[in-house]
Design a protein with these regions (language model features):
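Enzymes that bind and transform nitrogen-containing heteroaromatic metabolites
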Residues: 2-31, 47, 88, 155-157, ...
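Generic short beta-strand
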Residues: 36-37, 159
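Zn2+-dependent cytidine deaminase-like catalytic core
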Residues: 37-137, 282-284
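Proteins enriched for Cys/Gly/acidic motifs involved in redox and nucleic-acid/cofactor modification
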Residues: 26-30, 56, 119, 128, ...
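Internal, well-ordered alpha-helical segments in soluble enzyme and binding-protein domains
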Residues: 92, 114, 118-121, 134-142, ...
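Active-site beta-strand termini and strand-to-loop segments that position acidic
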Residues: 40-41, 150-151, 339-340
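Solvent-exposed, charged/polar functional surfaces in cytosolic regulatory/catalytic domains
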Residues: 20, 66, 144
Length: 340
């Protein structure tokens, strides 16, 4: 059995594994965006892997392939308990055993009945196994997937851009652009890590959005989220009002409940709701917002359109209080992130 690694080495390996998982977020659903690293006794990382799109290799297998023979006697650090079942790919726990890995650290237990049990399989094969604690102030790409598995619906993030005094558009209806280029680039990077972008029919008709994930030069990013519209108004005969969505393709559902059911059933686990005010109000009223991404611009309007179209609670005591988990300057704007 190889010597145990220092805690600092394990912590660094976990951060690298979490980063690898974050890089593939949005491309793996319905599978989780897992990251894995292989670290021999000397302490250097020799293999890094992340979950491939559905049907492809899991993170552990990718990391083992990169590590090669150096995996024997090494430590694997994985963001999710290695799976113990055979689906489209073989069980990762067995792959680690076959590679001669001496110990495995994992961040989250696998909550799915069909895949759980990898830690026990490893232990029975003589591999040392231990569960790690999440490092503070580090974004965890598995949170939406874990939530979706637990609740059987997609994790919902509400995103909006507003002025300092809370408006998303001026009195004349103009809203392009409230935020600057850095914030808009960040939005597109975020879109590329989501399974679906959701808007209401009002926004689809008024703004003619593309709902794509683009680079600053206008070119498309590698991963494009599903484009989803909620509402009963017909977009097919709307002329130029919704021409981009008709050209690119979109899904439309009559209600939030139908949308969430169908999206989950077809593999979506992590969705971004971008508006408008009516849809945002409806999601909040239904208690279906799990996180908020608020982009705040250094503008004051005094009058205009607000984030919400109608009240979602009657009293402060009844209001959902979100907790701030992140704050990021983006040029002169700032992104504030909240979770329930």
């Amino acid at each position: 059995m190889s010597a145990e690694l220092q805690d600092s080495t394990i912590s660094a390996a976990l951060l690298r594994a979490m980063a690898a998982g974050a890089e593939v977020r949005g491309t793996t659903s319905p599978n989780p965006p897992v990251g894995a690293v292989i670290v021999p006794p000397a302490g250097e990382i020799v293999g890094v892997g992340a979950t491939q799109p559905v049907g492809g290799a899991h993170a552990e297998v990718m990391a083992l392939q990169e590590a090669g023979d150096k995996a024997r006697g090494a430590t694997a650090v994985v963001t999710l308990e290695p799976c113990a079942h055979t689906g489209r790919t073989g069980p990762c726990a067995q792959a680690l055993i076959d590679a001669g890995v001496a110990r495995v650290y994992y961040l989250h237990a696998d909550p799915t009945p069909q895949a759980a049990g990898g830690a026990e399989v490893l232990a029975q094969a003589g591999v040392d196994v231990a569960k790690l604690e999440k490092p503070p102030h580090v974004e965890d790409a598995l949170v939406p997937w874990l939530f979706a598995v637990r609740t059987q619906r997609p994790h919902v993030t509400l995103k909006f851009a507003q002025t300092l005094d809370g408006f998303t558009a001026a009195a004349d209806g103009t809203s392009q652009w409230i935020t600057g280029e850095a914030a808009r680039d960040w939005v597109h990077a975020d879109r590329a890590h989501r399974d679906a972008i959701v808007v209401g029919t009002g926004t689809a008709l008024a703004d003619n959005p593309s709902l794509t994930a683009r680079f600053s030069d206008g070119s498309l990013r590698a991963h494009q989220p599903r484009r989803v519209v909620i509402g009963k108004r017909d977009l097919a005969s709307a002329g130029d009002a919704a021409s981009h969505l008709r050209e690119l393709g979109y899904e439309q559902y009559d209600s939030i409940e139908e949308a969430l059911y169908e999206l989950y059933a077809t593999g979506a686990r992590d969705i971004l709701v971008e508006g408008g005010a009516g849809l945002a109000s409806s999601f909040l009223k239904a208690d279906l917002v799990d996180a908020i991404s608020a982009y705040i611009a250094p503008l004051l309007l005094g009058e205009g359109r607000g984030v919400l179209a109608h009240p979602v609670t009657q009293t402060l005591a009844e209001a959902t209080r979100f907790h701030r988990v992140g704050m990021k300057p983006l040029g002169d704007d700032v992104l504030i992130e909240y979770v329930r």
